[in-house]
From Swiss-Prot:
Name of the molecule in the record: Recombination protein RecR
InterPro entries per the UniProt record, alphabetical: DNA_Rcmb_RecR, Rcmb_RecR, Rcmb_RecR_Znf, TOPRIM_dom, TOPRIM_RecR
Pfam families (UniProt xref): RecR_C, RecR_HhH, RecR_ZnF, Toprim_4
GO MF annotations, alphabetized: DNA binding; zinc ion binding
Length: 200
């Protein structure tokens, strides 16, 4: 079936979203045009507004429409000197949802990947270096993903911390709560055994 040029453009634009292939994009486009034109206009307006107004926090690099985000602006978040380093703004949302962290964040917007040409300055490690030099950070909690690249990035940042005499710690990785040992992969189980803690 031949479709209009504008419809093709809409479907192609929808495909920029993660996990959206040609069929999903077609379904979304048809739904908006057939059943929810008002919703489509609201979506277009919200997207346009967000793309022009949302930038990065000057302190932690997360998404915000202000120069400094609400977390970095909160004096109580500065008192304990904790800085949690994450790979993406979505990771901040995940950590915040636990209610267990009361410090500040630094968002890398990725991880080191020499094969892809992504070096330290590409993920803001020069900015992190400057923040460590300021002297208001006592401990850096490395919450990068447990991948080869995430581990390499954590190691690099730990070295930076050592240079500035700032404590560095790594979030624990291991068996999920409610998980069964026989279903856990070997690498995760190894991390669990190595990261065990005493009960008495």
């Amino acid at each position: 079936m031949r479709t209009s040029h504008m419809l093709e453009q809409l479907m192609e634009a929808l495909r920029c979203l993660p996990g959206v292939g040609p069929k999903s994009a077609q379904r979304m486009a048809f739904h908006l045009l057939q059943r929810d034109r008002k919703g489509g206009l609201q979506l277009a307006d919200a997207l346009s507004h967000a793309m022009t107004e949302i930038g990065h926090c000057n302190e932690c690099r997360t998404f915000t429409e202000e120069d400094v985000c609400h977390i970095c602006n909160n004096p109580k978040r500065q008192e304990n000197g904790l800085l949690c380093v994450v790979e993406s703004p979505a990771d901040i949302a995940a950590v915040e949802a636990t209610g267990q962290f009361s410090g500040r964040y630094f968002v890398l917007m990725g991880h080191l990947s020499p094969l892809d040409g992504i070096g330290p300055s590409d993920i803001g490690l020069d900015v992190l270096d400057y923040r460590l030099r300021r002297g208001d950070i006592k401990e850096v909690i490395l919450a990068t993903n447990p991948t080869v690249e995430g581990e390499a990035t954590a190691h690099y940042i730990a070295e930076l911390c050592r240079e500035h005499k700032v404590d560095a710690s790594r979030i624990a990785h291991g068996v999920p709560v409610g998980g069964e040992l026989e279903l856990v992969d070997g690498t995760t189980l190894s991390h669990s055994l190595l990261g065990r803690h005493k009960l008495n």
